[in-house]
């Protein structure tokens, strides 16, 4: 069994972040892309698996170029449609059409960004000198994405766990390390129970809170406090179940990944992070980042027989537009 580990320090990350913020302010935001690449390079270099560390090869210039391409492909059309609605006196039917077109552009942005950002980040990541790659086609993911949301709406949310596992299967099974690919064996039925429990609990709590407010049974503030204190742990539990299920059903060769994430561990991580951020007014962000990295790498292992030394490099070309798409609306499509 081989495990992951993280060796970074919050103090080092804080020093880097202070310099990055200062340079970003001086350059009126232009340094943001170089700062992002610098932080990633540090985090990857401090992440190890089976004793060997990862490396990040992306550059600020590539991220900046990707951002410009994303602006041309999605940003300009989206903001142009918004500007037309705001500044032109248009008939109601035309205004509605522009709103629909803007929504479509935004809807298309998400799957395109997911695929292309993953493609870029994989090809800019290496381990033992061998790079990862992602070979899924954007058009195939678009079909999956449209179908998933359509069926989810038609089934009143019941199809959502199946959509999520199909999405994960696409991303994992099209990811390669050198010349060998990862595989995903999960199925939507495996997440149906956690999803149903979370959804039912959410509806029940919201209905009870709404009823209490309508009948003035309790103080409004106390009633609303019930929502985060009850639903927060439930949704953290669902997140943990999803992460564990995804990794437990991911294979590489004859070996299978395994995650030791539990609700208790994940809740402790998030509560500790929240306390650190509140007590330091956000200054503990570097330590929160280190805590997260150490937690998620430490709970992941690869079990079974696999000869990693036999993996060969397989070079593929990639585009940085996906990275720019993620920066464009700040949705943060990082590696799952």
Give the positions of each predicted feature:
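Hydrophobic, aromatic-rich membrane-embedded alpha-helical segments
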Residues: 18-38, 145-166, 271-291
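Hydrophobic alpha-helical transmembrane segments of multi-pass integral membrane proteins
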Residues: 23, 63-82, 102-113, 147-155, ...
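Membrane-water interface of transmembrane alpha-helices
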Residues: 31-44, 109-121, 159-175, 236-248
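Juxtamembrane inter-helical linkers in multi-pass membrane proteins
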Residues: 43-57, 121-139, 169-191, 244-266, ...
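Membrane-helix interface segments in multi-pass membrane proteins
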Residues: 77-106, 204-235, 239, 289, ...
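Membrane-interface helix-loop-helix junctions at boundaries between adjacent transmembrane segments
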Residues: 89-98, 118-147
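Membrane-water interface at loop-to-transmembrane-helix junctions
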Residues: 140-142, 146-147, 183-199, 262-272, ...
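Intrinsically disordered cytosolic tails
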Residues: 229-336
């Amino acid at each position: 069994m081989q495990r992951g580990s993280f060796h970074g320090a919050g103090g080092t990350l804080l020093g880097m972040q202070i310099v990055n913020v200062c340079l970003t302010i001086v350059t009126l935001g232009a340094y943001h892309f170089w700062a992002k690449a610098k932080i990633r390079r540090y985090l990857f270099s401090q992440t190890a698996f089976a004793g060997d560390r990862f490396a990040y090869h992306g550059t600020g210039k590539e991220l900046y170029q990707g951002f410009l391409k994303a602006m041309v492909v999605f940003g300009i059309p989206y903001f142009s449609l918004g500007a037309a609605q705001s500044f032109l006196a248009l008939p109601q039917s035309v205004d509605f059409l522009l709103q629909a077109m803007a929504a479509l552009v935004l809807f298309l942005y998400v799957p395109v960004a997911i695929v292309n950002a993953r493609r870029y980040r994989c090809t800019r990541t290496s381990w033992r000198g061998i790079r990862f790659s992602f070979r899924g086609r954007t058009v195939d993911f678009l079909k999956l994405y449209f179908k998933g949301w359509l069926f989810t709406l038609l089934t009143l949310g019941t199809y959502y766990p199946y959509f999520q596992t199909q999405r994960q299967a696409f991303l994992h099974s099209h990811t390669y390390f050198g010349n060998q690919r990862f595989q995903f064996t999960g199925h939507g039925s495996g997440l149906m129970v956690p999803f149903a429990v979370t959804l039912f609990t959410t509806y029940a709590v919201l209905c009870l809170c709404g009823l209490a407010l309508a009948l003035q049974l309790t103080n409004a503030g106390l009633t609303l406090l019930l929502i985060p204190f009850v639903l927060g742990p439930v949704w953290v539990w669902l997140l943990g179940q999803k992460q564990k299920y995804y990794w437990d059903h991911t294979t590489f060769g004859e070996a299978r990944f395994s995650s030791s994430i539990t609700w208790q561990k994940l809740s402790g991580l998030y509560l500790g992070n929240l306390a650190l951020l509140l007590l330091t007014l956000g200054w503990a962000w570097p330590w929160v980042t280190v805590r997260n990295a150490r937690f998620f790498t430490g709970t992941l292992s690869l079990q079974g027989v696999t000869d990693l030394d036999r993996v060969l490099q397989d070079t593929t070309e990639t585009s940085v537009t996906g990275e720019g798409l993620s920066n464009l609306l700040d949705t943060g499509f990082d590696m799952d």
